[in-house]
Regions:
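Conserved beta-strand and immediately adjacent loop positions that scaffold enzyme active sites
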Residues: 1, 22, 110-111, 130
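Active-site catalytic loop in hydrolytic enzyme cores
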Residues: 1-57, 61, 67, 71-80, ...
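CN hydrolase (nitrilase-like) catalytic-core segments centered on the catalytic cysteine
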Residues: 42-129
Length: 137
């Protein structure tokens, strides 16, 4: 364990958690990065806080397992929201999301890499499990 980040923006069903107030930066392989967990990437302030640490990358672990209607509503909204954070901050963003079905819930990802211009430069196919490998420049 090299550090801890607590999700800043909680969903209604996450009231059992305490939202985080700190935005630590981490370093691995010479890359300085910060974390925005799932819903955090819908808000400019969390991405800006990462940029303010001097990071070059936002890492976004996500668990977008939702009821089918909600999943369909969000299916094409994840990458545009994340792309906006890249354009606002000039940072790269890597998202790692779940995929598959569990009971009445479904997840389509996306697991992707976005450049500072907000362009998706690598992505796993939606609905397909896999491992995405990308070398940051």
């Amino acid at each position: 364990l090299v550090g801890r980040y607590r999700k800043t923006h909680l969903l209604a069903g996450e009231t059992c958690f305490t939202p985080g107030t700190d935005t630590p930066a981490f370093e691995a392989g010479g890359v300085r990065f910060g974390i925005n967990i799932c819903y955090d990437t819908n808000f400019a302030d969390t991405a800006r806080a990462v940029a303010d640490t001097g990071a070059t990358l936002i890492v976004c672990p996500a668990n977008n397992m939702m009821r089918r209607a909600a999943a369909e509503s969000w299916r094409d909204r994840h990458n545009p929201a994340r792309a906006e954070r890249c354009r606002e901050t000039g940072l790269w963003l890597i998202s790692a999301d779940v995929t598959g079905e569990r009971g009445e819930r479904v997840a389509w990802g996306p697991t992707a890499v976005l450049n500072p211009q907000g362009e998706v430069v690598a992505q796993l196919p939606l609905e397909a499990p896999g491992l995405l490998v990308f070398d940051l420049p």
